[in-house]
Every structure is written in structure tokens, then in C-alpha cells.
């Protein structure tokens, strides 16, 4: 009997030891798994923060239309815009082609309305390059201030047609070439050429498009975006259409841009170009970052994929910017407001139950001097108001 109890006690003890060891093993694996998870959350440099931005449901717009209106929060990129993706792709492609070598006094030159320049300047700080940015003088001062803070050489250029050698893009191209041949300047210049560089649309085909598809679990009816260089709408549309050709792609275009008529009628034309109304600089809008009056290589990729287009007025963009702040706490820039106006128009056209995806491109903090400046707006004959409904968006 004593041996029986002794064996039982021994068995219980062994079982206790086994359970103790099993628990220790479990805890060690849990700690290791937790440590591994933490390690995976560490990225290498600011470039590692680019992409995988959140998708946000814009509650007020969704509730008002009965559609699921989602927006990719691209302002959450470290440079606060989707241009981070483009800048990184252009620089990496240039490195692969031997056009850029880090820490050799090489400089990246670009002509930009601001956001791409900010992304380039930010990445040049991290990747070992200088940055030289040429931007139109009518763009918000906030952007040039950020560029200078990031160490970029900034030149604000008087707006001019693209055929003018002093156009900001042509100025950037010319100075990049001069840098390379001038032996008195160390290193060489690389012209990023975002309007024509295929790395632009490829950045969105490789990252933004797949992210949208994954975040929506492949369930979306339409995608809406504006176009400046054309790279964003080209890359995302090309990816989404490759997954589901039935997805509707819609262009949101501001006043003065010829893309609206190019999509609808095949002619690059704006009403401002009518006989008797021509001006030296046709694009006359408070909206920054989208709208153009020429075909770019990147937009040529997008054009056959775009199914429809909406013209969005400055007044509508201003009203939407205030509406989003008041009803959703979303403080966004002018191109984002344009996108949201177009999203509501399309939602009204499609009817309840559809899912529409667009982009929130940059924060409102870059637009204090124009979009959120009441004095500036009144000079443009725009009276900023906080709308209580979406009646300012026609169906």
C-alpha cells in the first residue's frame, strides 16, 4: 500500500514538473514571439515608414449618400503625401541604373508644385543626396518653407507655359544637366522628371494599388483621383483594373485643367481657352497638385483606363474642406477636397450600396495661406462657409 502511494506521489510530482516545464516553454516562446513581433515593427530609416497607410471610412459622406466612401489616408506617409512612394521609386530606380550614387555629392533636381519636392528632399536627407527643387511661385509658402527646413535648395519660378524654357520643369532639367557638365560643381545632377518618369506610375502599381485591393478585400465599385503628373491615377487604376475590369475609374479635375475634356471628348481643352478668353497662364484655380493642360507620359498610361470625369469648382473644394473638418475632423488639402466632392457626386449617381475609394493626399496644414485663408479666398470672390449639408455637391 505504501509503495502504491509512493508511486502515486512520484507520478504527481513528475506531472507537476512536466507542467512546470511546459509552462516555462510556453512563456519563453511567447516572449520570443513578442520580441520577434517588436523586431518586425522596426523599420530602417524614414524610407521604411512609406506606404501601408490606413484606409478610413468617411462617416459623414457615407451616411449622407448610403454608399461606403473610403479614403486612403496618404497624408500619413512621413512626407505627408503619396509622393513619398514616387520619390522613393524614382531614386531607387536611378540608383539601379547607375544614375545616382549616395554620398558622392550627387543632387536630385525636380520641378514640382511642392509635394514631390518635399518627398524628394526628405529622402535625400536619409539616403545621402542633395536636393534642388524648382516650384511655381504661386504655390503655398508653407511648402517652400518645409523644403528649406529639409535642406533643399529652393527656387520659386514665375508660372509659365511648358513650352517656355523658364517653366519650372524646364528650369530643373536645365540646371541638372549644367550640374553634370560643370566640373566646378562636385558630383552630378539627376533630373527626376516626375511627369514623364515611368517610375511614377509604377510606384502606385507596386504599392498603393495592391494595398487598396487588400484593404477592401477585393470589394470596391469605383476609384476616384485627381491627376497632376498622372502617375497616381495611372498606377492604381492599372492595378485595380487588372484585378477587376468592372471597377469604375473616375477623374476629379479642377478648373482650368484640360484633362476633364480630354477624358470626355478626347481633346485637351478647357473653357478658359475659348476665343476671347485666353490668358498667359490658363490654369487659374486655388487647388494645388492636380490639373494640367498637357499630356504626360504617366497620364497616357491612365487615359484608356479612366471611365468618367467630374469637374470640381473651387467653391465646391472650399466647401468640402470645411465640411470634412466640421463633420469628420479631417483637416485635408485642396486636392483631397476635390476628390471627396467627386466621390459624393459619383455616390449620388450610382445610388446606395456601392463602395467608392479615393485618396486624402495631404494635410490642411500645407494650405493655410490659400485654401484656409479667408482674405485670400475673398480676393478670389469665394466666400468660405461651413455647410451643414452636401447640397453644394450636385448629383
Curated annotation (Swiss-Prot):
The modification N6-(pyridoxal phosphate)lysine is found at residue 83. Its EC number is 2.5.1.47. GO terms for molecular function: cysteine synthase activity. One of its GO terms (cellular component) is mitochondrial outer membrane. It is an enzyme of class 2 (transferase). Its cofactor is pyridoxal 5'-phosphate. It holds the Pfam family PALP. Disulfide bonds: none annotated. It catalyses: O-acetyl-L-serine + hydrogen sulfide = L-cysteine + acetate. Putative cysteine synthase that catalyzes the conversion of O-acetyl-L-serine (OAS) into cysteine, the last step in the cysteine biosynthesis pathway. However, in contrast to cysteine synthase cys11, this CS-like protein seems not to function in cysteine biosynthesis, at least under normal growth conditions, although the transcript is produced. Belongs to the cysteine synthase/cystathionine beta-synthase family. This is Cysteine synthase 2. It comes from Schizosaccharomyces pombe (strain 972 / ATCC 24843) (Fission yeast). The lineage of its organism: Eukaryota, Fungi, Dikarya, Ascomycota, Taphrinomycotina.
